[in-house]
From Swiss-Prot:
It is found in: Cytoplasm. SMART domains: PCRF. Peptide chain release factor 1 directs the termination of translation in response to the peptide chain termination codons UAG and UAA. Belongs to the prokaryotic/mitochondrial release factor family. This is Peptide chain release factor 1.
């Protein structure tokens, strides 16, 4: 099937979906209605661009016909030639855009995410940088109109974060933040540095798509659930009733502890949401590693321990090492203006996939 047959098939299916979504039987079936609505939304842009492309093709045919009929009318002929020239340029642009739109979609792109940030090498300075990254993503989410909820945070005593887990909810969150997983390096002079020397520290970021219970079922026999008293500053028990929850997935030894909420059930629900995402991500990463062993990985699926970005404070510089992008906009980026970086990563990823497809 060539590209035009594929595009026509997408348009035919889009029209079929429009009819199905107005069918009372489909509307009354919530699960099916949501699935078909998602499918329609995913193909909407492709269909819109394809229809514009077909109009441009028609414009070319009309202009060619006009040139034939314009003998003896130089002004009309010149106008038709200009229309033909512009339409041919537009046709090439639409064809390029359609090739990208036909690339296989990541099924997780529309999902919410679980975001984990940990201070790594560098002690207190790494924990402070983890806090900076949290603030950066929080502001970026705000700019995108997403909901950002800190689910669990572990402070280090100097205003930094040893670890933080957040849920980011909204439209196409994973499609934009999936490239953030990896090691983020910071180069700056710590407040405690009397000699003015630049120190290097690292924080790690992990982005996982939210996994619904119906999508990934964990056998209850594989879980150990401990209930205990939540502790406050200094380790004292802050609740008379045990509300804190620890869940361990025995086959992988993945552990989640939750004590932020006031009730055991709410802590359990949040812990299950995180552990479901972590376990699903664990097995997805194993499968991805096997796949990457056979072919070169794209930017979106690199080694989780790979250093992906450096934030250099003295030079106000941010460098993304995967695509060789350097921007002298550190202040702006840390204040949540990540669009230029993320757009470049998406374009690079799509270009790599297109090259892979054309091999």
């Amino acid at each position: 099937m060539n590209i035009y047959d594929q595009l026509q098939a997408v348009e035919d299916r889009y029209e079929e979906l429009g009819e199905l979504l107005s069918d009372p039987d489909v509307v009354s079936d919530t699960k099916r209605f949501m699935e078909l609505s998602r499918e329609e939304a995913n193909s909407r842009e492709t269909v819109a661009v394809y229809r514009e492309y077909k109009q441009v093709v028609q414009n070319i045919a009309d202009a060619q016909e006009m040139i034939k009929d314009a003998s003896g009318d130089p002004e009309l002929e010149e106008m038709a030639k200009e229309e033909l020239k512009n339409s041919k340029v537009a046709k090439e642009e639409y064809e390029e855009k359609l090739r990208f739109l036909l690339l296989p979609k990541d099924p997780n792109d529309d999902k919410n995410i679980i975001l984990e940030i940990r201070g790594a090498a560098g002690g207190d300075e790494a924990a402070l940088f983890a806090g900076d990254l949290l603030n950066m993503y929080q502001k970026y989410a705000e700019n995108q109109g997403w909901k950002f909820e800190v689910m669990e945070a572990s402070a280090n005593g100097v205003g930094g974060l040893k670890e933080v887990v957040a849920m980011v909810s909204g439209q196409s969150v994973y499609s934009k933040l999936k490239y953030e997983s990896g090691a983020h390096r910071v180069q700056r002079v710590p407040v405690t540095e009397s000699q003015g020397r630049v120190h290097t520290s690292t924080a790690t970021v992990l982005v996982m798509p939210e996994v619904e219970e119906v999508e990934y079922e964990i056998d209850p026999k594989d879980l150990r659930v401990d209930i205990y008293h939540a502790s406050g500053a200094g380790g004292q028990n802050v609740n008379k009733v045990a509300t804190a929850v620890r869940i361990i997935h025995l086959p992988t030894n993945i552990k989640v502890e939750m004590q932020e909420e006031r009730t055991q059930q709410k802590n359990r629900d949040k812990a299950m949401k995180i552990i479901r995402a972590r376990v699903a991500d664990h097995f997805a990463q194993i499968a991805q590693d096997e796949q990457d062993a056979e072919r070169k990985s794209t930017v979106g699926t690199g080694d989780r321990s790979e250093r992906i970005r450096t934030y250099n404070f003295p030079q106000n510089r941010v460098t993304d090492h995967r695509i060789g992008l350097t921007l002298q906009k550190l202040d702006s980026i840390l204040s949540g203006k990540l669009d230029e970086v993320i757009d470049a990563l998406i374009l690079y990823d799509q270009t790599q996939k297109l090259e892979e497809l054309n091999k």
